A protein has these predicted regions:
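Long, intrinsically disordered, low-complexity segments
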Residues: 88, 163, 246-302, 385, ...
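Conserved, well-structured interaction surfaces
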Residues: 28-45, 65-134, 149-162, 168-182, ...
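An aromatic- and glycine-enriched ligand-binding surface/loop that stacks and positions planar moieties
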Residues: 8-68, 137, 161, 169-170, ...
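Sec-dependent bacterial lipoprotein signal peptides
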Residues: 1-6
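C-terminal substrate/ligand-recognition segments
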Residues: 320-423
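A glycine-rich, coil/turn loop motif that links secondary-structure elements
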Residues: 111-117, 180-192, 242-244, 435-438
Length: 531
């Protein structure tokens, strides 16, 4: 696995302080430590929290994590503290500082290019992510300077994306396809290709669904980039979906293309305690910080490929049977046996009538009646110190990017069903061969596959933004299980617990506001429309 112990030591000290004292950036080992220090800037497990920004999940605390809860409900403003979680010019400074120091180093060219590829990948990803949230943003290139010092105005979003693409192109050129030994887990050529494919998919979506313009060349490029990842012949789907989200899979699977790296007892995260309610797992500890919505749970298909509203297989008394296999591997579901602190397995029963620790609105009980198994190890003794890596890109996404892009510009291409069917086969679902050429239906299928495959991986929010469906799916409450405990738990016609009200204003919510704190320091920053 990627050795980050040097990184952890390095982060104990200020790298700028080290540089100014002329005690750093002398050797190849120094450069590697400097680059390692950038890896924690990659998106990590907190992206699981951010699935609450979509229609997949709700935060149990209406305020939540410095205002993330406000964003999730659509009641945030320019003063909301959580905006700074994505407005990351301190990260841009650190990345450019590292790049600037590298350029002046005399080390082996092959190593120098590899380090540059890693740095430029992280730089491209940071700018891409900020542009997705804020649209037009200041663009600082090559030389490290603070945003306040530069006092730059905002550059057009496309100019920012073009610069990000320039950087990811160099990453593709410089990065190796694979690593060995302690370097396994570092950023690869495949990861860089995935980032670029992701960017082109996003640009194509905005051009088509927001601007109503032809985007054929953008879709074509997204498909071509995904195909290049496929043609590397390095990746495949794991047979067991659940395995991917356990520590045993860390750098030990064929599907993950890039992940945020964690280490037992050194670099850890708290997803198990956040994903669990009270009373489950070997410790019984759980905060139920975020809960899946009824809409998400109900959207999983039956094994005949139909919805629960259409299929004759659906049984309200046994609603989790004959469903997409990912359903039981992603969620704790009412009535399904779950591990308890005494080692027994008893049904998870969150309805308040049962007075269990996991009951709705109990402290640590959640608000919808559903909880997460994904990224949650119920046998873990230290539930606030998980070391399961957090995936940024998986081969399943490669296949679905390929299928989505092909469907938009060449809907009769048989490669579409080839790609989609692989993902569906693992989930125990039938193929979609009969839908080839039905662009609208295939579009819906692919979108649902993305929703179910990437729960908790912070894909859904960006998807509903780029598809321009956020104004529909986020303008409705997030519901939970049925209120009447005497009705079948799968009876979707009954009144449900209201988890949270939500709102989405299409006149402004497709972009976040520029943080007021940033505008106070830089008067050249204008605000986004209607904020």
């Amino acid at each position: 696995m990627l050795t980050l112990s040097g990184c952890a030591d390095f982060l104990d000290r200020d790298p700028l302080e080290q540089a100014s004292a002329n005690t750093f950036w002398k050797t190849e080992a120094d450069v590697e430590k400097g680059v390692n220090a950038l890896y924690p800037l990659l998106p990590g497990e907190r992206d699981f929290w951010r699935d609450c920004e979509s229609d997949n999940s709700l935060m149990t605390n209406s305020w939540g994590e410095n205002g993330l809860g406000y964003i999730c409900q659509g009641i945030h403003n320019a003063a909301t503290g959580y905006l700074s979680e994505e407005w990351k010019y301190d990260h841009i400074y650190r990345i450019l500082y590292c790049l600037d120091k590298l350029q002046g180093m005399e080390i082996k060219e092959e190593k120098k290019q590899r380090f540059e590829g890693e740095i430029r990948f992280i730089l491209a990803l940071k700018y891409y992510r900020m542009a997705r949230h804020f649209g037009d943003i200041p663009l600082i290139k090559e030389k490290p300077v603070s945003l306040e010092e530069a006092a730059l105005p905002r550059s057009p979003k496309q100019e920012v994306l073009d610069y990000a693409i320039e950087n990811v192109n160099k990453a593709i050129e410089y990065l190796p396809e694979t690593y060995s030994g302690d370097d396994v887990g570092r950023i690869t050529k495949g990861a860089a290709l995935m980032l670029k494919a992701d960017m082109y998919l996003d640009m194509a979506s905005y051009k088509k669904f927001h601007q109503g313009e032809e985007a054929k060349e953008l879709w074509k490029e997204a498909a071509s980039l995904a195909k290049k990842v496929i043609d590397l012949n390095l990746y495949g789907l794991e047979n067991d979906f659940a395995f991917l989200f356990k520590a045993a899979a860390n750098n030990n699977n064929k599907e993950v293309i890039l992940a945020h790296q964690y280490m037992e007892d050194e670099l850890t995260h708290m997803l198990p305690v956040l994903c669990s309610p009270s009373g489950v797992g070997v410790t019984g500890r759980g905060w139920a910080s975020f809960c899946p919505t009824r809409d998400l749970v109900d959207s999983y298909e039956m094994t005949d490929g139909k919805t629960i509203y259409e299929s004759s297989l659906y049984d309200m008394e046994h609603p989790w049977e004959n469903r997409d296999a990912r359903l039981k591997k992603t969620f704790m579901l009412p009535g399904v046996d779950i591990l308890r602190p005494d080692g027994s397995y008893t049904p998870y029963m969150p309805h308040p009538a049962y007075n269990n620790p996991e009951r709705i609105n109990n402290e640590g009980g959640g608000i919808t009646g559903y909880m997460y198994l994904k990224y949650n190890d119920l046998e873990l003794e230290k539930v606030d110190a998980s070391w399961t890596n957090f995936s940024l890109y998986r081969y399943a996404e490669t296949l679905l990017i390929y299928a989505e892009a092909l469907n938009e510009y060449e809907p009769y291409n048989a490669e579409i069903v080839w790609a989609v069917n692989q993902v569906r086969k693992r989930a125990g679902l039938p193929g979609v061969d009969s839908q080839l050429g039905n662009q609208e239906r295939m579009r819906t299928i692919i979108r649902e596959e993305r929703r179910h495959e990437f729960v908790g991986e912070h894909k859904r929010y960006f998807d509903i933004l780029r598809w321009k469906t956020a104004e529909v799916v986020l303008n409705q409450p997030g519901y939970g299980i049925n209120k009447d405990e005497h009705t079948a738990i799968g009876d979707y016609t009954q009144e449900k617990f209201l988890g949270q009200e939500r709102t989405f204003d299409p006149q402004k919510h497709y972009l976040w506001p520029i943080p007021q704190s940033a505008r106070d320091k830089n008067p050249n920053l204008t605000q986004n429309p209607n904020w």
